[in-house]
């Protein structure tokens, strides 16, 4: 007689790869996008869930302003940096020229992008 409370562990081996690929595809196709980011007179569509997961700044902003499809106007953000930040959020990597790197990192820090922004725990203390 088999015990009915026996548990089985099931694992999707390429789950993370699939999720990254799927979110990138959804963004590229503009499928299910639910937020528009605007800067320098241009716009980018994105997903609230991705922005919230990758940035406490966007998470707080979206929680404070719950609307079906908000348009977030970003002052003092270059469109090229916004595109690169979204690429980083959706793919986990991005190419940025050496010339653009300092300004890009400053923008990423201002928008609190995880993996790019300095957090108190990642700041090295000199002792």
Curated annotation (Swiss-Prot):
Keyword annotations of the record: Activator, Chromatin regulator, Developmental protein, DNA-binding, Nucleus, Repressor, Transcription, Transcription regulation
InterPro entries linked to this entry: BTB/POZ_dom, Dros_DevTransReg, SKP1/BTB/POZ_sf
Main localization (coarse): nucleus
GO CC annotation, single: PcG protein complex
Top-level lineage group: Eukaryota
A single GO BP: larval lymph gland hemopoiesis
Name of the featured protein: Longitudinals lacking protein-like
Protein species of origin: Drosophila melanogaster
């Amino acid at each position: 007689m088999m015990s009915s409370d026996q548990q089985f562990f099931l694992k999707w081996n390429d789950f993370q790869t699939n999720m990254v690929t799927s979110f990138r595809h959804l963004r590229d196709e503009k499928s299910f996008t639910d937020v528009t980011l605007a800067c320098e007179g241009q716009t980018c569509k994105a997903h609230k869930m991705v922005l919230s997961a990758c940035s406490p700044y966007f998470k707080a902003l979206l929680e404070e302003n719950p609307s079906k499809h908000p348009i977030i106007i970003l002052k003092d953000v270059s469109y090229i940096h916004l595109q690169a930040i979204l690429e980083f959020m959706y793919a986990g990597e991005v190419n940025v020229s050496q010339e653009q790197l300092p300004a890009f990192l400053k923008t990423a820090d201002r928008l609190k992008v995880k993996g790019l922004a300095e957090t108190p725990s990642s700041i090295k203390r000199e002792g």
